[in-house]
Curated annotation (Swiss-Prot):
GO terms of molecular function: phosphorelay response regulator activity; protein-glutamate methylesterase activity; protein-glutamine glutaminase activity
Enzyme Commission identifier(s): 3.1.1.61, 3.5.1.44
Entry protein name: Protein-glutamate methylesterase/protein-glutamine glutaminase
Active-site residues annotated for this sequence: S165, H191, D287
The gene coding this protein: cheB
Family that this chain belongs to: Belongs to the CheB family.
PTM section of the record: Phosphorylated by CheA. Phosphorylation of the N-terminal regulatory domain activates the methylesterase activity.
Subcellular location: Cytoplasm
Swiss-Prot/TrEMBL catalytic activity: [protein]-L-glutamate 5-O-methyl ester + H2O = L-glutamyl-[protein] + methanol + H(+); L-glutaminyl-[protein] + H2O = L-glutamyl-[protein] + NH4(+)
Amino acid sequence: MSKIRVLCVDDSALMRQIMTEIINSHPDMEVVATAPDPLVARDLIKKFNPQVLTLDVEMPRMDGLDFLEKLMRLRPMPVVMVSSLTGKGSEITLRALELGAIDFVTKPQLGIREGMLAYSELIAEKIRMAAKARLPQRSTTAEPTKIIQHMPLLSSEKLIAIGASTGGTEAIRHVLQPLPPTSPALLITQHMPPGFTKSFAERLNKLCQITVKEAEDGERVLPGHAYIAPGARHLELARSGANYQVRLNDGPPVNRHRPSVDVLFRSVAQYAGRNAVGVILTGMGNDGAAGMLELHQAGAYTLAQNEASCVVFGMPREAIAMGGVDEVVDLHQVSQRMLAQISAGQALRI
């Protein structure tokens, strides 16, 4: 079996060395070349035709974002960003995902070598996934998002739960942007490390008609609001009297993830049941599949993103295979379908 060919681009000689060491330690991949900046990388891409690029976010001569934008326009290929755990780093990384990067890994703030080596399996997993991923389709013209109209005011009992992983930041944006302010509350788990979820929520809040925020423990769940699970904390739905409430916990990872989609879906099945719609979007692995089955069995209507519009079809595929999905839809139909089901209650249940 041929190895996955990787080009590493980083202005730090130490990082290039560490990434090479990590990647070459896995038998199914190899670093074919390294570059200290995007201008050198441009020539090496032509020479070595790599399958995956790892790209530092902040570099001299041409920064990672400028290079990524040009690359995705002229020679689209799977890119895994390497980002710092800073506010600026998270903002740039989210912009990179918007431009078409498949995923990202974070540099530890202290003990670079030890920290990166500890991420060896995760880095290898992201490279394997990137090599097989479907590149996000970038629109050539920026069309304004059409807000869904004629959404009646609904009972505060109505709720939407969304789970996503790889490719999910852009998928979630596509789902939330058309929603009117009268939408029901949304609880969202996106696999993402601490330090990124707050920036992600703030970015979405600027783009959407609804209010988008990082979830806080104990706050009341309100219509017209979307609550994003904080990195490294499970997000659950709870009740306080007649109202829904956010619960955050630091329990062990589920399906290797914290936050976990299964944890969210199971709590929504318990407390919202047939008042809920569950949505599983693009992502690697099986997190959310068992929880979606519980949602389905509790009477919720369940949607999965179709393979053609997923960056990675892993999570939707597993949910479909378990029998917990009512309807499989293209990403551009998700917003309309979930609101239609919320409005119709169980009348349109398949």
